[in-house]
Amino acid sequence: MKILLLTLVVVTIMCLDLGYTTKCYKTGERIISETCPPGQDLCYMKTWCDVFCGSRGRVIELGCTATCPTVKPHEQITCCSTDNCNPHPKMKQR
């Protein structure tokens, strides 16, 4: 009986995946996939135009967040909750 209970406890712990955190793409010097800090379980992609928008295209920011950011005028924001669900648009073409 003790072995059965111990087995159930071990299986339960393995199935819970304790301490899981989301992985998101983040922008910086280069685009990388990183584990998000605890409490930041969403990935986001924010785009907007700056003064170079006509020649370079929209600015793209990727990262982790606890809540989806509020959209400001002339910004577009998308949020998602699975690992690396916020790839840079050019990465999707590969």
UniProtKB/Swiss-Prot annotation:
Presence of the UniProt keyword Signal in the record: yes
Molecular function as annotated in GO: acetylcholine receptor inhibitor activity; ion channel regulator activity; toxin activity
Disulfide topology: C24-C43, C36-C64, C49-C53, C68-C79, C80-C85
Taxonomic lineage: Eukaryota, Metazoa, Chordata, Craniata, Vertebrata
Keyword Disulfide bond: yes
Keyword vocabulary terms for this entry: Acetylcholine receptor inhibiting toxin, Disulfide bond, Ion channel impairing toxin, Neurotoxin, Postsynaptic neurotoxin, Secreted, Signal, Toxin
Similarity section: Belongs to the three-finger toxin family. Long-chain subfamily. Type II alpha-neurotoxin sub-subfamily.
Pfam families per the UniProt record, alphabetical: Toxin_cobra-type
CDD domains linked to this entry: TFP_snake_toxin
Gene Ontology cellular-component terms listed: extracellular region
Name of the protein described by the UniProt record: Long neurotoxin LNTX1
First and last residue of the signal peptide: 1-21
Tissue distribution of the protein: Expressed by the venom gland.
